Amino acid sequence: MKDVVIVDCIRTPMGRSKGGAFRNVRAEDLSAHLMSSILLRNPNLDPNEIEDIYWGCVQQTLEQGFNIARNAALLAGIPKQVGAVTVNRLCGSSMQALHDASRAIQVGDGDIFIIGGVEHMGHVPMSHGVDFHPGMAKSVAKASGMMGLTAEMLGKLHGISRQQQDEFAARSHRRAYAATVEGRFAREIVGLEGHDASGARFFYDYDEVIRPETTVETLSQLRPVFDPVNGTVTAGTSSALSDGASAMLVMSADRAKALGLTPRVRVRSMAVAGCDAAIMGYGPVPATQKALKRAGLTIGDIDLVELNEAFAAQSLPCVKDLGLLDVAEEKVNLNGGAIALGHPLGCSGSRISTTLIHLMEEKDANLGLATMCIGLGQGIATVFERV
């Protein structure tokens, strides 16, 4: 099979969903901005050679409906003969897009793909139009569709304290802010115009969502939001609501070499796995175990890890059971994560992969793991290797 390489990986800034920077920017525009940026950044690439575009999005309705991948591609000026499809594996959608493109390359169904994803959670809320089949109650508790309650359950099962959650969340903001002021995020962000609080046009090239003033002390004052009586999960220890997009240029190694394009990493292995919907946040553990086995690796071989921070109460059990607790400060989410940046559902898979790849280059790391939980009990994971 052909080797799959990532040639470029970028993202938009993350904007607050409630009256934030992109309140007047549509999801298609966020997506098209990155698609066109991929082409501008890689002039050796003839866009007519692109086989297909795989674009993750969860709430495929309103401005995100009717195949947003194709709509955005047309807005971006991608040649009309290039296909585009919207992919949905809930939180793992854009990582699934990467997996789909990778498999297509491996079996010879194309050499050049753009992948990515978007979610404008300010324009299309996560719960918009959701209508679960009543019959699901026979096998899945109703609370399993409420992500915050599944985090509460997972945290309780693993003995995760409120203090631990607050410390993890404060770390996320602290590290994300440091990555901003030290210019590390600038390497992955492609800025675009939005509107500031007064309504004036403003060019955003930084994440609006990070709260640098966040401390364990301020977080400790917040009340539990999902289980007000017995819970420990607060808004501050949950991933923020944000709007954003991410994208990658994925190619066969042979075609990248022929075009004189330098690969950043290769896709070493991929996996998805299911778990109990009541503890959906545990999905990264079985997915990672599968991906490592397929790569012939152990967790000790992995130099850097990006774990999507849906909730602190969800992330910490995964870190613990993956055997990363003692090395988390050196290996896991070194630039913070979704608690600070937000989790625009369809965007996050390629967003965390993009951050990971840039960190691997910065730290001269050989092997990296990107993994995330998925609503209703799934996990997805990708192992990357420097080339």
UniProtKB/Swiss-Prot annotation:
UniProt keyword list: Acyltransferase, Cytoplasm, Fatty acid metabolism, Lipid degradation, Lipid metabolism, Transferase
Keyword Acyltransferase assigned: yes
Gene Ontology MF, one: acetyl-CoA C-acyltransferase activity
Main subcellular location: cytoplasm
Domain of life per record: Bacteria
Annotated catalysed reactions: an acyl-CoA + acetyl-CoA = a 3-oxoacyl-CoA + CoA
TM segment ranges: none
Coiled coil: none
InterPro entries associated with the record: FadA (IPR012805), Thiolase (IPR002155), Thiolase-like (IPR016039), Thiolase-like_sf_Thiolase (IPR050215), Thiolase_acyl_enz_int_AS (IPR020615), Thiolase_AS (IPR020610), Thiolase_C (IPR020617), Thiolase_CS (IPR020613)
Enzyme Commission number(s) from the entry: 2.3.1.16
Gene Ontology annotations for the cellular component aspect, listed alphabetically: cytoplasm
Active site feature: 91 (acyl-thioester intermediate), 343 (proton acceptor), 373 (proton acceptor)
Pathway terms, separated by semicolons: Lipid metabolism; fatty acid beta-oxidation
Swiss-Prot/TrEMBL GO biological process terms: fatty acid beta-oxidation; phenylacetate catabolic process
Subcellular location: Cytoplasm
Main EC class the enzyme belongs to: transferase
Record-stated family: Belongs to the thiolase-like superfamily. Thiolase family.
Purpose of the protein: Catalyzes the final step of fatty acid oxidation in which acetyl-CoA is released and the CoA ester of a fatty acid two carbons shorter is formed.
Oligomer status and interactors: Heterotetramer of two alpha chains (FadB) and two beta chains (FadA).
Name assigned to this protein: 3-ketoacyl-CoA thiolase
Organism of this sequence: Aeromonas salmonicida (strain A449)
Gene symbol of the encoding locus: fadA
